[in-house]
């Protein structure tokens, strides 16, 4: 049976827009008259099937490269009657659950793009349409891809089939292609000539009326919400990404271990240098990332891969290999080991996020998010991607600390002289389900050809003794300069005055303080300076020592009352941290931070600023947790790093730290429990879900009587409880109009909960009830209007029904798009927080330590306009001092 020419023209328009375009790796198959009858991919297996159908085994020998100007549309237009459609015959089919022969009419020349495979359902129907309905069916076919879009739900596809059966009754008994289902990705696929994907299940439906029965029986079922799209493959591959196929990837830990081992060796011998060069040349594998491949065992969060062909690590590796090849020839034997270690240091620094602004580290989630290449079989895996990105951030932060320890640890003399390096494993594992034709192959390049070697004029041999003498003289001059600086610049001293603790600047010896000699002290703003202590009286002075160091630090003169106040506050803070008095910490954090700032002004070497930063961060994190119900792992990781630094400085913590308290409260949050239970109930079907939602509302009402709920807990309780009761009211309502209004209200409440909790929950009961009510209303209105109507009126009514269903489908598409936008925004915000938060935390700690180590704040003591010492407590809510931004930094003076 030939297809109606009008319908065929409509399909040609659809194929131009939604079929996979011909590319350079596709082949054309011609018949005995050299007329094209099919286009196939280079790895397609349908040629044998086509040969069996046409009973012409010579077709397999008639493959020729497709001309660049020939595509699917031109094939159809050139010879629409030269076998454009073929009967693809399987030896057995599972239509209807039984095994029997079934001839199915389908396209041999087209494959639909990812997400539009549902169009294959209409191809067999096109042969059964009567001529009177040809124009209507053509319009139906042309409008459907724009109406449903890519990856519609199964319920939307079945609703369209119901509408098609109503408009075109002759297709009710028509066969449909096999519909496959993947239980792992929760995705349907309407198969084409390529057949059923491996390990996929078969849907028991072989004709249109069986699909309509499935639509009626599946109302409210969860699988009705699963997407219908193409078989699993990557949605697209950018031409700019082709370099990843040949790039070398090596496991991060393997490369780190190789470089750490290299720092322990001696490179005075030629064999040792060759061994390191060979190890670097053989490190890494190609084809780790390809068009059909994404990292072996890509979902293991502990496996992170390093791209050795991306800057900055590629540049440092090239410099290291060039030095091992020819660069060492200009150096003395005694200097080669040191220079090799310096090059290895630079390579290691590029692997640390603490030293390098960019990172070459990838896992599957980071690669997909950065390049926007998503695996279709894992439709909607944003939550898993967030977890993998979070694991990558924690891994890089942890390894940055490990690399820093390696750089510090490898300053000892070299003791090994004969070394064979640790080479990474022979080949990475390939997880099941990945294409077997894309196997990673190790790079085995010869050292002399691995890196281009530049021909340069080597400089003359350097004089070792001359360089040693210059170094000794430089060290002596530096020591003299440091001693002179320390002798001329004296530390600030704070002394008791009659009205206020003024800052005193001494310009002479200590005896000048009592004799009136020297430069004296600065004048007060309104008159004479306060009187000095009477001669002969002795003022007790104490020295604030740096608790972070075992050596004696700069002594600071404080009056007894001020020191007593500071010491009491500091001991209170230490006691609160040791006993984990979380309530006291939150209540007094502002006052304690103010005191710690003042203590940092008195002694910049002590870790008072670090402690103030920790207390301020704990307060802000806990406040944010109470308001939003969320605290990221990266934030907690930054607090754990600060706690380790404070322990090293002598601050003792008890069995449970404030960070662990926040972590425990987040894990035991009532809102988290309600959210988890709500997501579980949303997956239930039928009356069980309604009863479970009512029970959840009762549980929430009981727990809301507790007095320790956060603001976010109260908001979550109110939202979830209201929705649970709304669903129960809908189930008890019998009036269709009232029920539809309640469904609209409950759907809005559901979207609000998704926005608040960051979920993507859709209760099947609400969507099923809405579809049922609208379908009934349309059918009742159509039945009333058709009685005694003319054919033109019936056609207009059918078009109106189609417009109603199209409007309903568009509304569901908009709802799904809004949910995807919310999920994408949440994912992007989470990525920014998880990537930037730990890096900023480490950077702030490093900048603050460097700033105070250089005595930045003490420079205020030598400025004549220095006001008063902030000894008294500041007002509550005063922002803490931050390096390079606070009022104490010299760049901010006016």
UniProtKB/Swiss-Prot annotation:
Alphabetical UniProt keywords: Hydrolase, Protease, Thiol protease
Catalytic activity, EC: 3.4.22.45
Signal peptide start and end residues: none
A molecular function (GO) term: structural molecule activity
Highest taxon above the source species: Viruses
Site entry: Cleavage: 229-230
GO biological process, one term: proteolysis
Similarity comment: Belongs to the bymoviruses polyprotein 2 family.
Protein name: Genome polyprotein 2
Organismal lineage: Viruses, Riboviria, Orthornavirae, Pisuviricota, Stelpaviricetes
């Amino acid at each position: 049976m030939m297809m109606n020419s009008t319908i065929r023209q409509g399909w040609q328009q659809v194929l131009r827009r939604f079929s996979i375009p011909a590319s350079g790796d596709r082949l054309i198959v011609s018949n005995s008259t050299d007329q094209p009858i099919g286009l196939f991919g280079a790895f397609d297996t349908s040629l044998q099937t086509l040969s069996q159908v046409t009973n012409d085994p010579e077709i397999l020998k008639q493959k020729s490269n497709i001309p660049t100007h020939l595509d699917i549309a031109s094939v159809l237009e050139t010879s629409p009657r030269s076998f454009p459609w073929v009967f693809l015959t399987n030896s057995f089919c599972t239509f209807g659950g039984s095994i029997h022969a079934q001839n199915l009419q389908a396209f041999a020349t087209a494959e639909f793009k990812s997400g539009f495979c549902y169009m294959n359902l209409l191809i067999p129907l096109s042969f059964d349409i009567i001529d009177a309905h040809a124009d209507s069916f053509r319009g139906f076919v042309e409008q459907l891809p724009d109406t449903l879009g890519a990856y519609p739900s199964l319920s939307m596809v079945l609703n369209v089939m119901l509408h098609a059966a109503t408009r075109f009754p002759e297709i009710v008994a028509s066969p449909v292609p096999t519909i496959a289902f993947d239980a792992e990705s929760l995705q349907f696929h309407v198969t084409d000539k390529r057949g059923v994907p491996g390990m996929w299940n078969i849907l028991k439906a072989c004709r249109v009326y069986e699909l309509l029965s499935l639509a009626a029986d599946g109302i409210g079922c969860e699988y009705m919400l699963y997407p219908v799209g193409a078989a699993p493959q990557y949605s697209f591959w950018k031409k700019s990404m082709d370099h990843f196929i040949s790039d070398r990837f090596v496991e991060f830990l393997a490369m780190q271990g190789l470089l750490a081992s290299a720092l322990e060796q001696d490179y005075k011998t030629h064999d040792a240098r060759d061994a390191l060069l060979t190890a670097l040349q053989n490190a890494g594998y190609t084809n780790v990332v390809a068009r059909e491949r994404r990292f072996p065992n890509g979902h293991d969060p502990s496996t992170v891969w390093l791209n050795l062909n991306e800057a900055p690590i590629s540049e440092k590796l090239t410099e290291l290999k060039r030095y091992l090849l020819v660069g060492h020839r200009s150096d003395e034997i005694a200097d080669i080991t040191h220079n090799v270690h310096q090059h290895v240091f630079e390579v290691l620094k590029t692997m640390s996020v603490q030293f390098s602004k960019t990172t070459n580290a990838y896992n599957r989630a980071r690669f997909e998010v950065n390049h926007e290449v998503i695996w279709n079989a894992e439709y909607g895996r944003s939550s898993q991607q967030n977890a993998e990105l979070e694991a990558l951030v924690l891994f890089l932060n942890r390894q940055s600390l490990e690399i820093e320890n390696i750089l510090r640890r490898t300053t000892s003399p070299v003791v090994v002289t004969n070394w064979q390096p640790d080479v990474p494993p022979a080949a990475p594992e390939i997880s099941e389900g990945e294409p077997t034709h894309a196997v990673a192959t190790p790079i085995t390049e010869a050292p002399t050809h691995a890196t281009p070697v530049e021909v340069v004029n080597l400089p003359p041999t350097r004089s070792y003794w001359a360089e040693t003498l210059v170094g000794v003289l430089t060290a002596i001059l530096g020591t003299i300069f440091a001693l002179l600086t320390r002798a001329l610049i004296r530390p600030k001293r704070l002394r008791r005055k009659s009205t206020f603790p003024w800052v005193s600047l001494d310009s002479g010896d200590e005896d000048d303080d009592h004799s009136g000699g020297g430069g004296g002290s600065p004048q007060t703003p309104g008159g004479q300076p306060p009187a000095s202590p009477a001669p002969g009286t002795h003022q007790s002075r104490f020295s604030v020592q740096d608790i972070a160091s075992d050596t004696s630090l700069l002594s600071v003169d404080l009056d007894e009352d001020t020191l007593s106040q500071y010491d009491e506050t500091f001991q209170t803070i230490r006691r609160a941290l040791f006993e984990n008095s979380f309530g006291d910490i939150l209540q007094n954090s502002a006052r304690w931070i103010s005191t710690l700032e003042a203590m940092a002004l008195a002694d910049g070497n002590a870790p008072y600023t670090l402690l103030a930063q920790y207390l301020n961060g704990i307060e802000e994190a806990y406040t944010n947790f109470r308001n939003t119900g969320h605290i990221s792992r990266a934030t907690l990781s930054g607090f754990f790093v600060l706690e380790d630094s404070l322990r090293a400085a002598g601050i003792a913590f008890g069995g449970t730290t404030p960070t662990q308290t926040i972590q425990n409260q987040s894990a035991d949050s009532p809102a988290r429990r309600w959210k988890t239970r709500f997501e579980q109930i949303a997956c239930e079907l039928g009356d069980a879900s309604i009863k479970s939602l009512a029970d959840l509302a009762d549980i929430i009402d009981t727990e809301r009587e507790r007095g320790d709920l956060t603001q976010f807990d109260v908001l979550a309780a109110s939202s979830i409880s209201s929705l649970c009761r709304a669903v129960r009211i809908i189930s008890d309502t019998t009036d269709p109009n009232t029920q539809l209004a309640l469904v609209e209200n409950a759907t809005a409440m559901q979207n609000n909960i998704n926005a608040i909790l960051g979920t993507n929950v859709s209760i099947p009961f609400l969507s099923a009830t809405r579809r049922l009510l609208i379908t009934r209303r349309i059918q009742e209105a159509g039945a009333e209007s058709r009685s005694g109507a003319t054919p033109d009126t019936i056609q207009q009514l059918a078009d109106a029904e189609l417009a109603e269903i199209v409007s309903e489908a568009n509304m569901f598409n908009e709802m799904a798009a809004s949910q995807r936008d919310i999920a994408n925004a949440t994912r992007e915000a989470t990525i920014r927080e998880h990537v930037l938060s730990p890096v900023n935390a480490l950077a702030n700690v490093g900048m603050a330590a460097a700033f105070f180590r250089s005595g930045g704040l003490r420079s205020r003591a030598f400025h004549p306009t220095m006001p008063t010492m902030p000894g008294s407590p500041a007002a509550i809510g005063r922002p803490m001092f931050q390096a390079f931004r606070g009022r104490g930094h010299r760049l901010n003076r006016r």
